[in-house]
A protein has these predicted regions:
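Polytopic transmembrane helical bundles with strong interfacial aromatic enrichment
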Residues: 1-144
């Protein structure tokens, strides 16, 4: 089996898993905020948020980085010096920072110290989609 294709497949699986979490967690936050007066509901949302973040998103993010770096190595380090790849890496760093920010939001919701509205979480829910669009076009077309 071609090791490059194996790692590319593993990278894509990790990316899809991570993106699913990045898109779903803020939506759970919306429901959590809108139901903050209902203890039974918030208890359920807290379990969902915790499991999604710690058991799916964090491992998927780490695997995305590991397999992505392996692909850079297998392609030859020269690929790292191509502008499209540098922009992609910056965008993945932004997604990682966004992931960490969602982790902070998770903690603030758990501690009942959240000051953000459901509208805020609806808006930031679009951030990973926009970044993903740019990454996909960079990887497919390598325009620069």
């Amino acid at each position: 089996m071609n090791s490059y294709l194996l790692f590319k497949s593993l990278h894509l699986i990790a990316v899809v898993s991570w993106m699913a979490g990045l898109l779903y967690l803020p939506r759970i936050f919306v429901y959590h905020v809108e139901n903050r007066e209902k203890k039974e509901a918030t208890d359920i949302f807290e379990v969902m948020e915790k499991k999604l973040f710690y058991y799916i998103m964090r491992p998927a993010m780490i695997l995305t980085w590991i397999f992505g770096l392996v692909l850079i190595y297998l392609n030859g380090i020269e690929i790292f010096y191509q502008l499209w790849m540098q922009i992609k890496i910056v965008l993945v760093i932004l997604l990682s920072a966004y992931n960490d920010y969602l982790g902070k939001c998770l903690v603030s919701l758990k501690n009942n110290s959240n000051t953000r509205s459901s509208k805020f979480f609806r808006i930031i829910n679009e951030v990973p989609t926009i970044i993903l669009i740019f990454i996909v076009f960079l990887v497919i077309f390598k325009p620069i």
